[in-house]
Amino acid sequence: MELAAWCGWGLLLALLSPGASGTQVCTGTDMKLRLPASPETHLDIVRHLYQGCQVVQGNLELTYLPANATLSFLQDIQEVQGYMLIAHSQVRHVPLQRLRIVRGTQLFEDKYALAVLDNRDPLDNVTTATGRTPEGLRELQLRSLTEILKGGVLIRGNPQLCYQDTVLWKDVFRKNNQLAPVDIDTNRSRACPPCAPACKDNHCWGASPEDCQTLTGTIAPRAVPAARARLPTDCCHEQCAAGCTGPKHSDCLACLHFNHSGICELHCPALVTYNTDTFESMPNPEGRYTFGASCVTTCPYNYLSTEVGSCTLVCPLNNQEVTAEDGTQRCEKCSKSCARVCYGLGMEHLRGARAITSANIQEFAGCKKIFGSLAFLPESFDGNPSSGIAPLTPEQLQVFETLEEITGYLYISAWPDSLHDLSVFQNLRVIRGRVLHDGAYSLALQGLGIRWLGLRSLRELGSGLVLIHRNTHLCFVHTVPWDQLFRNPHQALLHSGNPSEEECGLKDFACYPLCAHGHCWGPGPTQCVNCSHFLRGQECVKECRVWKGLPREYVNGKHCLPCHPECQPQNSTETCTGSEADQCTACPHYKDSPFCVARCPSGVKPDLSYMPIWKYPDEEGMCQPCPINCTHSCVDLDERGCPAEQRASPATSIIATVVGILLFLVIGVVVGILIKRRRQKIRKYTMRRLLQETELVEPLTPSGAMPNQAQMRILKETELRKVKVLGSGAFGTVYKGIWIPDGENVKIPVAIKVLRENTSPKANKEILDEAYVMAGLGSPYVSRLLGICLTSTVQLVTQLMPYGCLLDHVREHRGRLGSQDLLNWCVQIAKGMSYLEDVRLVHRDLAARNVLVKSPNHVKITDFGLARLLDIDETEYHADGGKVPIKWIALESILRRRFTHQSDVWSYGVTVWELMTFGAKPYDGIPAREIPDLLEKGERLPQPPICTIDVYMIMVKCWMIDSECRPRFRELVSEFSRMARDPQRFVVIQNEDLGPSSPLDSTFYRSLLEDDDMGDLVDAEEYLVPQQGFFFPDPAPGAGSTAHRRHRSSSTRSGGGELTLGMEPSGEEPPRSPLAPSEGAGSDVFEGELGMGATKGPQSISPRDLSPLQRYSEDPTLPLPTETDGYVAPLACSPQPEYVNQPEVRPQPPLTPEGPLPPVRPAGATLERPKTLSPGKNGVVKDVFTFGGAVENPEYLVPRGGSASQPHPPALCPAFDNLYYWDQDPSERGSPPNTFEGTPTAENPEYLGLDVPV
């Protein structure tokens, strides 16, 4: 059924398409079942309305038509926008054979789109008895009607009507109109013949074969032609209505929505389109206005075009009506509040009013334009005593003398007998007729006692008919050129019941002789439509008073206009050329060039001026300026009328001065007294409030945030001992030192950051801010602050990390690092950053250089110089400026200075990339200013050669443009923990299983141990939470059998002069408290009994439970069963897993043809490193195991000084202006105090200021 709905016979081949050129549109009527105002002219009214009409824009109402009426003028109608009503008519047929669609935008009785009512012969019963064929509607003959979009059908009281019950109305109704009511009366007084045999299923509109109903909604399969049975091309387009001639939307017989130049569309083309290239709105040359169901290039006359592309009769809210010079009308948005307008009947608050009465007439006082209509009914002049409405008087009608335009209609069926015309509307120029009386009339006058019309200024009737009916004394109807007033061919004058021209001639009613073409609105010279000669005011005259007569005039076209009163009348020439005083030929009194004046100005202030002007007339009558131009107190004048010179008396000046001084003193004393009293009152009020106040001054506004109870330890300078300089920079110096707390016999290795002398307050504030941030941190993966020393130069005391920064560590040991080392570090850094996210701290400077190595298995995040704590209601931090590491931070941080935890995720991805490339420089060779453009174009760091796609995809996710698409740190912890359990699956390092088994001690570590003062030290964390030693821990005595086994480090020298750390079993350690950190202060790497470089012996293996639950560690980065923020609980009763990753056990590699792997360079080596392949563009590394040139990183600079005998080792990269990057031996490099060489951190090429455009 769905396919057949628009197939087969739905393709009507013989009918016109909706795009037929020259479509004639007419307005319908809205009289319902009311009797026509003029039955004599009713048929003429219908003919004028629908002659040649194809689309009825309103309702098609055919009522009260006589039996002999010729209705052939209806045969062109194809579409009705509203409803169709055929009622109380005696015609046998209505020729609407071409009507295709009834849209039902208005419905009869709010329900019916088609109503056929009481079309019968009044003498139906009599004619039947006498044998005469009765009149009345016999057949509908709507053979082309295939669509009713909205509304039902009502057919009643048609005794002669046949075939209405044979129509398949379900097929006529649109799919969404299937529930429309159908009320059909089949009671008839005659027998109806059957439908023609050609009509399938006996569906027809009449007896003729041409009247068979065309089915477009339900079609029997047998009715479909065999050659085109149910083909998709046999279906109409979805925008078609009433059938089609082909499958395209240009083949529709009628359009479902809008007809655009013969093509059916869902919407008309918009007037404005958006240009995506220039980001601006552009006029659409193909744009169309919506007019009914059509798309038109311009709105029809009398309709208003809107900005949204519609043709309307009333402007929308906050819009005003504007008429252009070419006569087009449009709605224009008011720049401010719209000016007040006068509403007539049918609009706004007068929507329910029927007529103009004494209760509402004053609303039209002073109105030049009325939006709406005017109607004068008998009740207007009779009043309504029950409602307290008095009768309308002739004097009250004078309010309409200023009226010039009516947008609706003017209907008058009652008028005062004392008024012989409609001269109260003498200035009315336009009746637009956008709303018509009964849907037909813009001007209707009936039953009046007036003698003539008197509408002398009326020049336009925009729409509708003119009805002048049954006015028994009205003349001059035929002397008005009505055709010049009409604006469309469907307009006409309908008159009846008025005096004839002969009767008016007998009354001596004729136009004034000077009226052009004999056209007038009444008798006399003021009622001419146009004048044959000249017009003076409202009168037609034969000539103007140019040379004679008073007042003198000048000619402007056909108008006689008076000269200015100050012009001297001339006899032989024109008195003036215009109506202004400067257009006179001569002046009768004086001339104040160029104006003629009655007298010269004396003390007159010109417009927009406060200075008076004094002039006197000379002998020729010309006004000359006075020598003295007095501005005030101009009393004494000379004989010419000019101000006389006056000398001011000194007494006046003295008096004025004295009075002014006294007044100033009095005011000063009064003001002083008032100020003193005011202060006393304020002081008194304040004391009273303080004595009586029982509540807090400020209201409580709790934020809900937890208090920061971190402790800040203040150290005395006597507790600190500086051993040697580790590095220097613009901020000051970093020392290796020892902290010896007062009263305790312990030595704690520390790093002391000392600001240099004369440091700016900003530097002091920044180091205190850094101390504030570090003091509140308590994670094993974040560097701890031990305290501050508030001397003249602030000193920051932190943990001393024996292995230096992670960047130097991976570069120095790139040939001896394994996959588990790298992945364990990734896990620990992610856990540290996850902790920072939990405490709402944005780091802003995460990089491998800012991660310190406490032990080869334990790293910590440091450098909180750029970190920012977020408040409880903050989710991001916006930087005001400063330097940032462009190549490490996220794109939104570069462009918008926006820093969040997700921007730290970006930096984490770059840090992982540094580890996986063994310390390569990101985006090497690319200037920092080009980084934003490069990132916006989608370029990212390349995949490191040792990384599998799994690891690289995590990096790529960290570098997503949308920060919300990046993973969270807790997700990164989970991902890298999973990879750390099976490291060689995710990080592939060649010959990893053959790598050296020597411990990963660094040159920096050896330099620390060479100092004699570094023995017998206690680790800072062990001092704060006691546990094993720092460099040379002693075995814990008295260890229980259920405690963890611990390690003891021993220091030996290898044959090559390298320092090796061995881990020997030291027995069992005592049980820890639940708050005590695990080995390495919470290291995530299991450090069982297998030490670095030690051989696993049988004695190191303790008995274990061989159950499946304990044979494998769930998390190889943390084999202990419970973790609480980096700390572990005792395992007194839980056996440890049997299989875990052992990152430190590597077999000795065999000798290769090229020889064994090169050892770490000794401290005194002076030979250059062999040149290696430097990283290419964007950090691509050709040889992952050779980074000889990567050590000379511009981020790290060495203080000037030192001797040639002890050059700076190339293996080290001490950081500049950072307390965690060390110099190998700066104490031996003499440098003048407070002098620095090199580039400070602020000038680091990896950091770029946010306040500089990038």
Curated annotation (Swiss-Prot):
The modification Phosphothreonine is found at residue 1166. Its EC number is 2.7.10.1. The keyword Transmembrane applies. Residues 1146-1161 have a biased composition (Pro residues). The chain crosses the membrane at residues 653-675. Gene3D superfamilies: Cytochrome c1, transmembrane anchor, C-terminal, Hormone Receptor, Insulin-like Growth Factor Receptor 1, Chain A, domain 2, membrane-bound form of the juxtamembrane domain of the epidermal growth factor receptor like domain, Phosphorylase Kinase, domain 1, Receptor L-domain, Transferase(Phosphotransferase) domain 1. The modification Phosphoserine is found at residues 1054, 1078, 1083, 1107. Residues 1195-1197 are annotated as: Interaction with PIK3C2B. SMART domains: FU (SM00261), TyrKc (SM00219). Residues 1029-1116, 1133-1179, 1223-1254 are annotated as: Disordered. The modification Phosphotyrosine is found at residues 877, 1112, 1139, 1196, 1247. Residues 720-987 form the Protein kinase domain. It catalyses: L-tyrosyl-[protein] + ATP = O-phospho-L-tyrosyl-[protein] + ADP + H(+). Glycans are attached at residues 68, 125, 187, 259, 530, 571, 629. Homodimer. Heterodimer with EGFR, ERBB3 and ERBB4. Part of a complex with EGFR and either PIK3C2A or PIK3C2B. May interact with PIK3C2B when phosphorylated on Tyr-1196. Interacts with PRKCABP and PLXNB1. Interacts (when phosphorylated on Tyr-1247) with MEMO. Interacts with MUC1. Interacts (when phosphorylated on Tyr-1139) with GRB7 (via SH2 domain). Interacts (when phosphorylated on Tyr-1247) with ERBIN. Interacts with SRC, KPNB1, RANBP2, EEA1, CRM1, CLTC, PTK6, RPA194, MYOC and ACTB. This is Receptor tyrosine-protein kinase erbB-2. It comes from Mesocricetus auratus. The lineage of its organism: Eukaryota, Metazoa, Chordata, Craniata, Vertebrata.
